[in-house]
Amino acid sequence: MWSYEKRLQFPVNIKEPNAKLAQVIISQYGGPDGEMGASMRYLSQRYSMPFKEVAGLLTDIGTEELGHLEMVATIVHQLTRDLSREEIEKSGFANYYVDHTIGVWPQAAGGVPFNACEFQVKGDIITDLHESMAAEQKARSTYDNILRLIKDPDVCEPIKFLRAREIVHYQRFGEALRIAQDHLNSRNFYAFNPGFDRCDSCET
């Protein structure tokens, strides 16, 4: 299905290690509003989406989120790859180091492991699209918080890129919601779920 290009969507070239920053940014790898959950959410939601154009959009964005996951992992890797033992101890990175050395492992900034309970697939068109729109806004807010903590332009620029893509995804999911509603009974979008109820004339 996929063709993998051996380059990032946006260049990441970090010169200075920073374990404290890595511990924050890793939340967008495996945290509650991170790229791992986003990719799994959209690539799972597409199967119960009966409208081809919307299912295609979920596939496109879910695929892009995998690229964003790779970017975040690269940022974390470059921030930690040249750490000295002293830097690990002083930065508070020791707890992570004990379990993972400097490997990239999915967790939130607070150390909570990635959990599939952080995202949902209800199999209901309206519910799932609202879930996706909310997810993009939460990710954007998280990137906003990260940007407030960054001084290194080598880190700031790729994070800005990722934040901008969350806004675009939010807008595209808004368009998808409109497309889905155009297919439904305009008098009551919640009368039935065409992803499950095979009766387009159902009304309440």
Where are these regions (language model features)?
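Non-heme di-metal
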Residues: 1-204
